[in-house]
Amino acid sequence: MRAKGGTSRGQKPGSLEAHERLVAECLEELALMGFAAWENPRRAVQVNGRWVSLTKAGRGDIQVLLARQAEGRLFGIHGEVECKTGQSGQSPKQRAHMRMVRNSGGVYIVARDRNEMRAELELLGFAARLPAA
């Protein structure tokens, strides 16, 4: 587990702040598009002196409910956004989780900026539910 303000293995100083900024920008864009979305932070507790993760490895940084209209009914589709900055790529656990979400009918997007995320959602047929600001 990383201490607050620290960095994960392989991250350069300052990249944690860039990642947090990207997550905030993507959350803002999803809100502007009219979708319910929230950050999916890593959670851990200490048990007998050891840190134990409470979250699934590989999950996206953001969870979102994507609205889809079908046969006059509104459905919420599970979606996740994995935010990547710099040259970082997905870990094997993230790729496995992405496949699981997509194979279950959900949407999993890897985004390096808010515009890329919005474009990919629109390409998948999830247009903004609210007019663009």
Residue ranges of model-derived segments:
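Catalytic phosphate/metal-binding cores of nucleic-acid and nucleotide-processing enzymes, i.e., regions
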Residues: 1-133
